[in-house]
Amino acid sequence: HVDIVPTLLDILEIETATKYDGRSLMQQVNSHDDELEQEFYITECTWMRKHGWRTPEWKLIIALEPDFHFKPEIELYNLKDDPNELKNLVDLRLDMVSVLKEKMDKWIAKRKKETGMDSPIFEQGDWHGIQGHGSFKSSQEAYDSLYIGDANTAKRLQEKSR
């Protein structure tokens, strides 16, 4: 999201002296695949706080609190062999977990040094909207605490849309 304003300014050919945390993505839009960044930091904060590192071949996901789908704390997928991410290879490829985690940690440290700020993913304990609650302690607590809806409401909504 930090790249949206710089990208829009670039598209509209508007120059400004304002410094932004992000950068224009027009170079990526106009480039060939071999010029694009091949590895990057990923975050997920919709229902659970997770972060990870992705390469063209691998995807590492680390949960920062228990997952309400009861997924493991660490997930590793080979995206070429398993594009649907069905086979977690953590136990078989601890070497790759270490390599990717080190790359991720270096990137996080670099961004903190550049901006002087920690990532909000680490600092916003009440990110899920339950004031004063903080991080979940178990998958069951996460599941019980988040309103996901109930089956009867879902059924009524589905019937209305027909």
What spans do the regions from the language model cover?
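Non-transmembrane alpha-helical segments in soluble domains
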Residues: 5-9, 13, 26, 77, ...
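Acidic-residue sensor for enzyme active/binding pockets
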Residues: 44, 75, 85
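Short phosphate-engaging motifs
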Residues: 49, 85, 96
